[in-house]
Amino acid sequence: MAEKHDVIDDIIDIRDGLGRLLNPLGGLTGSITDPAHVERFDPSDYKEKPRPNSIFCLRCSASSLVDQDVAVRTCSLCLDICPVDAIEINKASVRVKDNCRMCGLCTMVCPTESFIVQRLMARQLYDKIARAASTYERCYVTCTRALGRLPRENEVLLPCVGAVPRELWLSLIADFDNISVYLPLDICDRCRTTTGEDAYTNEIATAEKWSQASVGFEANGRGLNHEQARAYRRGQFMDDMRQAGLTALVATNSAPAGAQAIAKKIRDHADQLYDIQRSLEEAVGDKAASGHRRILTQKRKTVLGMLQLHPSLADRMRLEVPVCDVTHCTMCGICVRECPVNACDLDRQGHFSVKAAYCVNCGACATVCPENALTMEACDPRELVVRDVEAERRRRSAATQEERLKGAA
């Protein structure tokens, strides 16, 4: 249902129309007078070779704990998804060779985030897509091959759409209903990143199954919508009026300024993720029994933030965590040493436990267990719903204040 058009919208339309009349060439004037300063599209500007960190690599960790034939079975996700076999793992080291296509698929698939590409990290990518989705009627996620030009502000350009993990898709479509993938038909058939199409279809399908929401799809470049969202345009207009000193008009329409409101939304999301980590550390401890600090990956942190706002979605998720058969466990501790995020615990009494919120569900601990005492079983995803301690404190404070007011009356 369309939003009601009022006098504020009419004024905005008139202002925009006058702006186009007064400056019909827009940004073309500068390029005509000085062609050297024209920004040109270069796909390499949106690509970056991943930096591997062997400390968090599951196979590297296993190489120092078990035989090599067992170590190679712990994880091969990056090797399997790389379209040009550019990743080389040799015992305790990981190397990305020079034939890397810089597609970013290894960063998406690695459960422990062993491959670092700054622009593809979950936090940065969420902020970029969320900002575009909040500002415009539609936000498009696409790749350099599909777009072939400089992106507009509501187009998020990636080396491959498959670089977006399911955790990020889940968090985004739970919060926004205007995100689409733009890929012309058959564009992936001619791409040398041969594993990219399967990657993005699997990740999006899983996120849609868990969220019961959907990602849009656009194959026609001429059908892309670059209109700014009504709420954003109104917010920006009111901010312009505020700066111009027209306080009377602003007083009757106190909508938050568009850019400021979106910036606040992004900051609030970052603050929420920080509070979640702090709440987890207070609830289960920031260190494992071994004394090592627990690590919360960016992808997992994004999911926890989404579930805190939409706890009902937890019931649709299916995640597996290790479960210990105490009759087989010899307390050797290999499982604990294998876990790179320190989600596994083995206390002095021999009790094995796992913190589901930190566990990345890789199954490496079960693979390296010499006695096969660990098996991966479905966990209760509601364990991933982190209490919002600060919100609960505010509610208690408000309830106490209300009772005092009633008592005074």
PLM segments and residue spans:
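Cys/His-rich metal-chelating microdomains
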Residues: 60-63, 78-81, 85, 103-116, ...
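Ferredoxin-like iron-sulfur electron-transfer modules
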Residues: 37-74, 84-102, 120-126, 223-228, ...
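C-terminal segment of N-terminal export signals and the immediately downstream linker at the start
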Residues: 232, 251-294
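Flanking helices and flexible, charged tails adjoining ferredoxin-like Fe-S electron-transfer domains
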Residues: 1-48, 55, 64-70, 105-226, ...
